[in-house]
Amino acid sequence: MVHAPARSEDIREEVAELLGVDVDAVQPGSNLIGQGLDSIRIMTLAGRWRRRGIAVDFATLAETPTIEAWAQLVTAGRQDTDSAAPPADSSGDPSGETEPFALAPMQHAMWVGRQDNQQLGGVAGHLYVEFDAGLLDSGRLRAAATALARRHPMLRVRFLPDGTQCITPAVECGDFPVHVEDLRELGTDEVERRLTALREAKSHQQLDGAVFELTVTLLPGGRSRLHVDLDMQAADAMSYRTLMADLAALYRGCDLPELSYTYRQYRHAVEAQDAQPQPRRDADRDWWARRLPELPDPPALPITAGRGANRSTRRWHWLDPQTRDALFARAQARGITPAMALAAGFANTLARWSSNSRFLLNVPLFGRQPLHPDVDALVGDFTSSLLLDVDLVGAHTAAARAQVVQDAMRTAAAHSAYSGLSVLRDLSRHRGTQVLAPVVFTSALGLGELFSPEVTGQFGTPAWIISQGPQVLLDAQVTEFDGGVLVNWDVREGFFPPGVIDAMFAYHIDELLRLASADDAWDAPGPAALPEAQRAVREAINGRTAPPSGEALHDRFFRQAERQPDAPAVFAGSGDLSYAQLRDQALAVAAALRAAGAGAGDTVAVVGPKSAEQIPAVLGILSVGAAYLPIGADQPRDRAERILQSGRVRLALVCGGRQLSLPVPGLVLADVLGGAPADAEIACARVDPGELAYVLFTSGSTGEPKGVEVTHDAAMNTVEFIGRHFEIGPADRCLALSTLEGDISVMDVFVTLRTGGAIVVVDEAQRRDPDAWARLIDTHRVTVLHFMPGWLEMLVEVGRGRLSSVRVVPTGGDWVRPEVVRRLRAEAPGLRFAGLGGATETPVHNTIFEVTEPIPADWTALPFGVPLPNNVCRVVGDTGGDCPEWVPGELWVSGRGIARGYRGRPDLTAQRFVEHDGRTSYRTGDLVRYRPDGTLEFVGRADHRVKISGYRVELGEIESALRRVPGVRTAVAALIAGAGESDVLAAQVGTDDPALTGEQVRQYLADLVPAHMIPRHVAVVERIGFTAAGKLDRRAVARELHSVVGQSHSPGHRAASTPLEGALALILGDLLGRDDVGVDDDFFALGGDSVLATQAVARIRAWLDAPDVMVADMFANRTVSALAAVLRAAEDDPDRLDHVAELYLEVIGMDAESVLTATRQTTKS
């Protein structure tokens, strides 16, 4: 028995041994982190001492890292009652060495995760290495490998379908196969081609039956390449080092000491130990349980839609000894261990490329309990894991980030008696869906060189290394190599957009080199995550400028009226107007306003139904230097009065020919238009472009409308661009559908009139009638449509044969389906179509994407495009930095085209209009991302970001995936309050396919998004309605979905209707600890996990005589009804299982005496 350290000197000796230094180099009062002790080795000591009966933990040791402090902690912690229990029997059962035994927790996770139906599954835990050597003797290597397989039973392991493993006796295995590829007679190019093909085949294979494979390629010039492939379900990374060291020794002809202990015995002893009372483990489990509701998601890295390729790729960089020493010394001077310095650099890179800067990081641990002297020489899986809750939101320097990560490591390690894998299973049960931690940081610092001199001496230098693991996206590894540190990333690259991993890795390495080079780099803000090439693209597309005209919105109209007085300006059902007539009406409005005391700096409301008379009203208001504020006819009276008051309205012009009772003075517009016009010189009076032009009230999140103040110059940036870009002129006719309250009306009125075109007015009676729009387009040969996407959807449904005159369609404000573009161009060949992004606060548009080429078939919506001239668009992450390509963040717009702020709301203005780098930016609340070509892509709205099963999810991302389902035109996702349960994700889709079902949509989504993003309910309708503003009517959809969800819960769960369903419900309910499992209930949503699924399969096989059922069946068929259907389908006689289930149900209902009596009767018969 190993005794606990009793003196400081004993502790010094243990620390010196771990550091690989002389004991005199370890000073009692010195900071051990500064002397090279890292987190992993502190954890090793903590675990070692706890097993010796000393109550210490990693966090306490790490907080006071000196020999003197540790001696006091060890003395005080000797009476640990947790470890005072009698030690578990470590001998195991050697006589049963070939009997099946349970998988270790990490083995089980890999066994389940490698199945194709798992998230990020379909691959094995796998390590592949190539060594370049001289001429290897394949016969000697075969003999060495045969001896190696006899020495290590886990090289002869078989993984059984029931989730157990067993060892094949050595006598049944024969010689270990060593494959030989002879390429000595081939030319250089062919040799390289064959080596590449061999690497491609072996580096991603799933070994079938074998867990260890050796291949020797004989090369020209007396050279060889050794290919080593290991299934890591059989042996972890530390075991790989043991295997290669033993293989090298056996190849040299050395005799290795016999092992008197096996991995199977070790697992037996650990399980026996785990079965004993474990107060520390129970306390740590309770600690994690309290934290489950607040644990974050994994890093939300940019992932491509659909299922990516299973192949892994590697990025690597070698930090030479000088760089390593400088980096580690600077870290240790700040009390940061080397491993945590490297982990912090990795975490910072993740935060820069993630839409969440607080995330879960998976940290594997290599730890073997000292249950036998031979434990360190064994091969098997000894790994566990920690989950780190990393929060870098407020950490703006490298030193701060390193401290955050180190603190997170200490916190997790202080509660490591309950493993990270167990926490993930609990978190999955808590959220009702499978939770993964697919981003991994693996530190092998302190474990010695990756390949010992003995290994490289026999087999040569490593030429290629790659690993992969099931349910892992990115595994960052740091290990000691060739005197320095090797930094590797093994990545499932097919899941990421092109270029993302290269940019991330380059940023990571650049930061490590920067921190190694200078002390002040630790205390300065980190560099922006934008690689130079990305920065150049951003600067180019944001650097486009166009000289402003210096005009107010109405100026050019009055000049056009002088130039072409008889040209048509307005076509309306109430009567057409020439430019001269429209000018006179506008001046009549101006005269009436002046007579009423309204002028420069005032705000005048335009109240009432949409009509042609509103056009001279706004022109007259602007001509006297006032700003207009529209209030439509469908505004509730209370809301209209609040707008008039908060809008500080001086006077109201009332449309529709009738006086209203208003809280402000009012003039009937029909009366005003017939009055005498003001002096002509008023049309030439200069209004400063910096003055307000209009105030538009939009819905506020608090329920109180907010008034956006827009200057002439801000609006003119878009007006001038649209007119110039689309070459709009006197021959054009614009159909004005938008009400004045919608900012698209600014385009309808001012783009058209400043360029000499004519406005075709859609009045109040027509604005909800798409057929009327089509008639007006056809009658007046309309050429320009400033339409919302929803209006276009309605128009193409009814406009066939009547849209040929249309030549320009700028649209925006909602998702724009490519199909709309195709249908419009079928009606109007040569049509110029553009999707534009924008907001009332960035009047009217801030980006443009003109469709000039065929739209790719996989696009579900048009992107926002590139910024308009004089605008700058930033995509900002939650740390305040610019997001790299493909990473979503909030769109911030600055430049000429932004509003002044919110009327009477300085608090809201300060919140949304922020100062940054000397300029004012408007925070749009739109979630967007930059593509590599500088195109902005709309992802969703920040206010559509919801929590689903504990995950933060963009509803827009779900809607985008829904639109990828064949047959789906439009989609709206919503979070609906469930009946007596947590909120439910639901969706409504519009389709032309009458055969499409909600379940089919859900099944298709399984290949596009994770399980937690698949709506529980999908309602299929012929079409989703639009609001009067031309946007998808989300409120109406939410009401309909609420009804659907409520109806689905009202009857309660469906009970079993057959004996088989009853038996399955009973088996699953027993494992879940509940007696109310319905046949449609999701096993995993009720708290099931991979371990319980394995147990369920074992019981179903044994108790229902269904030997072919697999764990994969449980994951693919998550309900009792679905599982019963699969079991029946596999039977020649589908009724047989019901008979077996009847017997099971009968037996399970008997007491012990009844079972014994029945058994005796059966035996006699």
From Swiss-Prot:
Family: Belongs to the ATP-dependent AMP-binding enzyme family. MbtB subfamily.
Region called Disordered, residue ranges: 77-100
Record region (Adenylation): 578-973
Cofactor detail note: Binds 2 phosphopantetheines covalently.
Annotated region (Condensation/cyclization), positions in chain: 97-393
Species classification: Bacteria, Bacillati, Actinomycetota, Actinomycetes, Mycobacteriales
The name this protein goes by in its record: Phenyloxazoline synthase MbtB
Annotated SUPFAM superfamilies: Acetyl-CoA synthetase-like, ACP-like, CoA-dependent acyltransferases
E.C. number(s) listed in UniProt: 6.3.2.-
Source species of the chain: Mycolicibacterium paratuberculosis (strain ATCC BAA-968 / K-10)
Alphabetical keyword list: Ligase, Multifunctional enzyme, Phosphopantetheine, Phosphoprotein, Repeat
Domain Carrier: start-end pairs: 5-78, 1055-1131
Cofactor needs: pantetheine 4'-phosphate
Broadest EC class assigned to this enzyme: ligase
Residues bearing PTM O-(pantetheine 4'-phosphoryl)serine: 39, 1090
BP term (GO), one: lipid biosynthetic process
Pathway named in the protein's UniProt entry: Siderophore biosynthesis; mycobactin biosynthesis
InterPro entries according to UniProt: AA_adenyl_dom (IPR010071), AB_hydrolase_fold (IPR029058), ACP-like_sf (IPR036736), AMP-bd_C_sf (IPR045851), AMP-binding_CS (IPR020845), AMP-dep_synth/lig_dom (IPR000873), ANL_N_sf (IPR042099), CAT-like_dom_sf (IPR023213)
